[in-house]
């Protein structure tokens, strides 16, 4: 039989008060004596609950503006005391056993995220007593239950009811693991915050505060285990950040279909992040992390139809992302036309879900609408290390573009250039994208030489019978030689958008002028490896 421990006395001290009143009422109704501190104690007393202030229990007042509340032997002795081993010394010093500790910590992350947060504000939101109690209770989980998540309140009450007011060892052990994860994440946030301030903090006035902390502490929560990773011989799991603020594959809800695979998640992320670039109704189809068809239109149905036409062969078994609600007409078009692994959209109508339900293996995800893109960090694992950089949220406006050719682009060429520039950002380097009338007509991805990416984009367009003449071409990085321009001109490209910055820019511009091509510089590169 599981080793059970009855809960007779609980200490409650929480910054996040969500659910605490109901939980305390449930504990009190089951005969549990309540100890509490500061604001939590006042809140419980206001609700008519019998609660003893920790300062009354210890005989020692809170002091130093609340910095010292629970750091007392009567508190920590009651938590750390081993039942059946330390009973005599606890009785000698009038230490009552505390069977449950309910604590969550000062909101450090929320504090430092505020605009204008000072170092003093950050320091005052470093919890000391809370983590100490959490660690003490987790260490002594054989006898004490530590509760750090309000989402566990209901399950705890149900288990107490099923076990005559007791909790099993398995439950206490699971709660202890959550507690150590909680304090580890909390300390990591503090270390990252202070670590990024190291140069300035030590008074090196000529050196700005570091963009990246001296030691990088990462905290991710496992969302799911997977059958396997990128390949069947690799084990895998999906971890997500806590409190993600932007609609993403990590926050998406799966409303139908088989479990997502490792490759499904990677490809869905690529598709969703690409479709976020567009304000108009848009569709992005991705295969092996590369867009194989992208279009914008007046409806997502037409956008899907045009995106599919770019490369129907590659679209088979692909990932489809939209930036508008999935409607019934579009769902029917997809299901009738092709095999698809994943469809992701901000939402899906009931009628659309009835249609996709006919294909139970199709995974349908809804991620919610996004208002803006949230700056963050990108990571790339290398053997023995981690490359860290800012997320690529770089964008260029029409006003920032530089026309460097003799011929100015037409209005349509300019629209197509800006469209395919957005797409090129999400194509593996070397990336070349041909576009015409707000749809991709050829994509050359991942080639070791830029000219071959340009040639492949032209071949793709020809294979699908798409008219290249008068199209725009985007390149994610500069052209090192004129050959890429010559290849584009040979198939009818009339406008090129690229970062510029090559030592041979003059030769490349001259090639554009020779072919009557309008050339636009963005002065921004979008390598993607």
From Swiss-Prot:
Pathway(s) the chain acts in: Purine metabolism; IMP biosynthesis via de novo pathway; 5-formamido-1-(5-phospho-D-ribosyl)imidazole-4-carboxamide from 5-amino-1-(5-phospho-D-ribosyl)imidazole-4-carboxamide (10-formyl THF route): step 1/1; Purine metabolism; IMP biosynthesis via de novo pathway; IMP from 5-formamido-1-(5-phospho-D-ribosyl)imidazole-4-carboxamide: step 1/1
Gene3D superfamilies: 3.40.140.20, Methylglyoxal synthase-like domain (3.40.50.1380)
Record domain MGS-like: where: 1-148
EC nos: 2.1.2.3, 3.5.4.10
CDD domains: IMPCH
Any Pfam family the entry gives: AICARFT_IMPCHas
Catalytic activity, reaction form: (6R)-10-formyltetrahydrofolate + 5-amino-1-(5-phospho-beta-D-ribosyl)imidazole-4-carboxamide = 5-formamido-1-(5-phospho-D-ribosyl)imidazole-4-carboxamide + (6S)-5,6,7,8-tetrahydrofolate; IMP + H2O = 5-formamido-1-(5-phospho-D-ribosyl)imidazole-4-carboxamide
One of the record's GO cellular component terms: cytosol
Domain of life assignment: Bacteria
Listed name of the protein: Bifunctional purine biosynthesis protein PurH
Organism: Salmonella schwarzengrund (strain CVM19633)
